Design a protein with these regions (language model features):
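N-terminal "arm"/small-domain region of PLP-dependent enzymes with the aminotransferase-like
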Residues: 1-73
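Conserved N-terminal alpha-helix of the aminotransferase class I/II PLP-enzyme fold
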Residues: 52-100
Length: 138
């Protein structure tokens, strides 16, 4: 890695989403929304298994925590930090697992009739994306 790439443009010691979750947790807002464990109060067994630290910050998307579909604050900042860390122009956080991430990647890069080089053992999410966009595997 070149010396140039080891210097980050942004402060990589930040954790914007975690910091926002901690600020929200300290507000002690009473949950009337999903998830049903109500930050552990509604399911003591789950809290015992995962720990209060985990369930205490497992909350639904709300304004202080930004919105993954249209990030404008802490999620956008986290994406910018990730892009900076990887030396990329952009980075996008995903919550749908590998399948939605792979499909998003293929659907972004390919359109009907495009050829895409793929190995025989691709994940089925790639095949699904090919069906959706009409690209041709070669």
């Amino acid at each position: 890695m070149s010396e140039n790439r080891t210097r980050f443009r942004l402060n990589q010691n930040r954790a914007p989403i975690y910091e926002a979750l901690e600020r929200f947790r300290q507000m002690r807002v009473v949950p009337f929304d999903v998830p049903g464990h109500k930050r552990g109060r509604g399911n003591p067994e789950l809290t015992a298994f995962l720990g209060q630290q985990c369930v205490g910050v497992d909350v639904n998307s709300m304004k202080p925590l930004d919105n993954l579909c249209h990030p404008v604050s802490v999620i956008r900042e986290a994406e910018e930090l990730a892009a900076d860390a990887f030396g990329a122009a952009h980075a996008f956080l995903m919550v749908g697992g590998t399948t939605s991430s792979v499909q998003s990647m293929v659907l972004t890069a390919c359109k009907r009739g495009d050829e895409i080089i793929l190995p025989r053992n691709v994940h089925r999410s790639v095949l699904n994306a090919l069906v959706l966009c009409g690209a041709i595997p070669v």
